[in-house]
């Protein structure tokens, strides 16, 4: 045992006992270091799955609510077939209640919001009675994205995760909304495991070539796949980063893809 311990000490594996100390790491991505959120596992051998998972960093709250059992199908709110306005109304009500809970206002609710303005680096919300209100926690408002032709996105932050309220009064959903909100984007899948072993078995040379080709496309950012879905020809490719104007006038880039 002494010879073994000496060997471990000689190669630097064992060190003499020392006083208490702390270890500090650097250059660790915030997705690993401080952001708590969902993680996806996907077979990288399937390019469409790999693209979908990587792009799941941001997702539509309206779509997620409409297409799942988070919203009941009772009293005519079924989700099959074309757009169901009864279900759509429930989705929007749920989403705005979520905004009220996550980004509470000093007075009123998002359900009664009719307009958003930017005054002295703050967001001012007009309610349907004509009164003005602000966020209870003004630090939750982060920035703004101009999308042209009167459309814009409002960026908020809670627990290190971002949410974008998308305003577009020309959109079919935004047209019927008091504040012109067409959707709410939620920062969702923070990290993705691109799997080569557990969710897929890549064992021979052909399989491994597919895996590494897809992985190279992810690393270079040029992976894309085209396919036919319900008679429509679609192309899936990687999302770009999201650019916002901060309250202080500076620009910020947020990742458009999961780590």
Set out the residue ranges of the language-model regions.
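Active-site-facing alpha/beta catalytic cores
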Residues: 5, 13, 17-259
């Amino acid at each position: 045992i002494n010879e073994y311990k000496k060997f471990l000490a000689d190669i630097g594996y064992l060190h003499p006992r020392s006083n208490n100390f702390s270890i500090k790491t650097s250059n660790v991505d915030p997705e690993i270091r401080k952001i708590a959120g969902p993680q996806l596992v996907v077979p990288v051998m399937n390019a469409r799955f790999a693209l979908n998972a990587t792009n799941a960093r941001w997702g539509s709250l309206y779509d997620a609510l409409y297409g799942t059992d988070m919203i009941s199908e009772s009293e005519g709110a079924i989700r099959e077939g074309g757009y169901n306005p009864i279900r759509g109304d429930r989705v929007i009500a749920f989403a705005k209640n979520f905004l009220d809970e996550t980004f509470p206002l000093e007075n009123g609710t998002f359900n009664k919001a009719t307009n958003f303005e930017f005054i002295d680096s703050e967001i001012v919300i007009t309610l349907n009675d004509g009164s003005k209100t602000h966020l209870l926690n003004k630090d939750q408002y982060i920035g703004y994205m101009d999308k042209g032709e009167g459309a814009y996105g409002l960026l908020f932050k809670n627990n290190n995760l971002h949410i974008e309220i998308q305003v577009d009064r020309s959109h079919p959903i935004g047209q019927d909304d008091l504040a012109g909100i067409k959707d709410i984007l939620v920062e969702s899948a923070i990290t993705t495991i691109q799997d080569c072993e557990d969710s897929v078995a890549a064992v021979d040379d052909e399989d491994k070539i597919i895996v590494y080709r897809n992985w190279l496309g992810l690393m270079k950012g040029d992976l894309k796949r085209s396919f036919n879905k319900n008679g429509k020809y679609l192309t899936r490719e990687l999302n770009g980063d999201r650019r916002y104007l901060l309250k202080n006038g500076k620009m910020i880039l947020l990742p458009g893809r999961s780590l």
